[in-house]
Amino acid sequence: MPRLLGVEIPAKKKVAYSLRYINGIGPTRADLLVKEAGLSPDMRAQDLTEEQLNKILHLITEHKWVLEGDLRREIAGNLKRLQAINCYRGVRHRRGLPVRGQRTSTNARTRKGPRKTVGVSKAAAAAKA
């Protein structure tokens, strides 16, 4: 498995698909890298030579894209900033609720997690009666 930027990219997939395993590189950037490096779109990652890997790495650094750990840190910093200034979006992130205006009376289960059933136990109900 070839390694790029500390990420092992899958060897048996086409280069454009395997580059997407790097955080911050999606379909558009992957296709751009393959085209700029002069590689065949049908080429597999295991067939890349060391020279071609270096060419791809050079193109990535030349574009000055924020990738992998730096991108994760930047996103985490953005969320912390929103939470620190107590803006609406930050509060929604902090509470684990939908941020972009979705309804929460019903739905939003992905963000809120599984239902927490609120009810009375049988012992408490029997004691009241």
Curated annotation (Swiss-Prot):
The keyword Ribosomal protein applies. One of its GO terms (cellular component) is cytosol. SUPFAM superfamilies: S13-like H2TH domain. GO terms for biological process: translation. One of its GO terms (molecular function) is structural constituent of ribosome. It holds the Pfam family Ribosomal_S13. It comes from the Bacteria. Residues 96-129 are annotated as: Disordered. Keywords: Ribonucleoprotein, Ribosomal protein, RNA-binding, rRNA-binding, tRNA-binding. Located at the top of the head of the 30S subunit, it contacts several helices of the 16S rRNA. In the 70S ribosome it contacts the 23S rRNA (bridge B1a) and protein L5 of the 50S subunit (bridge B1b), connecting the 2 subunits; these bridges are implicated in subunit movement. Contacts the tRNAs in the A and P-sites. Belongs to the universal ribosomal protein uS13 family. HAMAP family: Ribosomal_uS13. Part of the 30S ribosomal subunit. Forms a loose heterodimer with protein S19. Forms two bridges to the 50S subunit in the 70S ribosome. This is Small ribosomal subunit protein uS13. It comes from Opitutus terrae (strain DSM 11246 / JCM 15787 / PB90-1).
